[in-house]
Amino acid sequence: MSRRVGEAGEQAAAEFLTASGYRIIARNVRFRSGEIDLIAQDGGVLVFVEVKTRRGRRYGTPGEAVTAAKQRRLARLASLYLARLGSEPPPCRFDVVEVEPGPDGRLRCRLIQNAFHA
């Protein structure tokens, strides 16, 4: 997947989440060991969001690409982010947004709340 497709997917996911009532706090939060695509707030919950964009289902659904190893890495990155806050961490969860082109070519998003637990 090209970087441009990934960026378009992240933009579509951010717009979708905002329309769903989330407040985007940060995008592409980088650490030495990786990156958190989106960090958002949903009510009183801090949400770490993994965005997976696919052009088709040849290799499965986008969410299937969030392997156990990817989940562990995202959990470690979330811990690093929370340590930066320095205060008592709020309730947190991990969501996945699957992004794929629809029949009309426009990107479609599907939210998987509480996609995994760390």
Curated annotation (Swiss-Prot):
Similarity annotation: Belongs to the UPF0102 family.
Protein name stated in the entry: UPF0102 protein STH1475
InterPro entries per record: Restrct_endonuc-II-like, tRNA_endonuc-like_dom_sf, UPF0102_YraN-like
One function term, GO molecular function aspect: nucleic acid binding
PANTHER family given in the database record: UPF0102 PROTEIN YRAN
Organism: Symbiobacterium thermophilum (strain DSM 24528 / JCM 14929 / IAM 14863 / T)
Pfam families for the chain: UPF0102
Ranges in a coiled coil: none
